[in-house]
Amino acid sequence: MRKEYLVSHIEENAHQADIYSLNVVAGNLWSASGDSKIKKWSIGDAEHSLVEEIDTPHKLGVHHLATSLDENVVVSCGFGQDVYVWNPETNEFRDLGNNAQHPSECWSSCISPDGQTIAFTSVDGRIAVWDNPSDCKISELDTKGKFGLCIDYSPNGRFIVSGHQTGQLFLISTETGRLFHVLSGHTSPVRSVAFSPGSTLLAAAGDSKMITIYDVLSGDQVGQLRGHAAWIFAVAFNPVGDLLLSADVEGKIKIWDIDTMECISTQSETDGAIWAVAWYKNGFIVAGADKSIRWYRAAATE
């Protein structure tokens, strides 16, 4: 069954460079860009006005934001492999690069649901898990030089998954700190991974132009979503877990019904790459190479 979405607001030139990450935090949308800024936008008002602009210490730009499920911790990763942990209420931050034990050349990060641990991928293939309050390393897995492009924490806190340049996916048990599954299905870079809200399913996508759905416990593939004609850089489940949002480098945005594994909506308001997507209460939000933020709502939503 098809579902219609409408563009409800476009914030043109929201940043001065590509927008690489979007996260909903404490009632606001956070956007991060190659211009080294993080901006907060109102979710509540129709104009989605700018709430606050933060000049970050990321001198080469910001490409990843991660938020804990309780929304009390935000981690930002920059192109200089610098990592900062933020208090979203006060905007106070600390530089994890000052920790001599911290892995160098960090690329992406994710945070446990309670905000107590942070996991990182790195350009040299390591996956490191750190205690957030103390900044002490809990565990580290070496994937033998395979660039970790993306990472996610399961909402139940039991698993971490990382996607790599080689197409490999590593599912790690947080209880043991060891590999739980090595997931097959991709032979080209995996650029985005996402757990379902119930932590039962995992979506992975990238240069293969398809989205693979896995059963988390068994590691089995349960679906392949085909329809994109270009590299996919972002996937995200909606809060209920019945829909999956995906976006590619040619500006195509798709919504998938997880029960039927079928595409129910396609949007294409820009030809530029979409680097980031996020859900909010009335629909979803996308941003990318054209420096704009687009807000969509379901056609039946007032």
Swiss-Prot record:
Pfam family of the protein (one): WD40
Domain of life, source organism: Eukaryota
Keyword presence, Repeat: yes
Record keyword Mitochondrion present: no
InterPro entries noted in UniProt: SKI8, WD40/YVTN_repeat-like_dom_sf, WD40_repeat_dom_sf, WD40_rpt
Residue windows of the WD repeats: 14-51, 57-96, 101-140, 142-184, 185-226, 227-266, 269-302
Any one GO BP annotation for this protein: meiotic cell cycle
Keyword terms, alphabetized: Meiosis, Repeat, WD repeat
SMART domains the record matches: WD40
GO cellular component, one term: Ski complex
Gene3D superfamilies named among the record's database cross-references: YVTN repeat-like/Quinoprotein amine dehydrogenase (2.130.10.10)
Subunit-structure text: Component of the DSB catalytic core (DSBC) complex, composed of at least rec12, rec6 and rec14. The complex interacts with mde2.
Function: Required for formation of the rec12-mediated double-strand breaks (DSBs) that initiate meiotic recombination.
Protein name: Meiotic recombination protein rec14
Species assigned in the record: Schizosaccharomyces pombe (strain 972 / ATCC 24843)
Gene: rec14
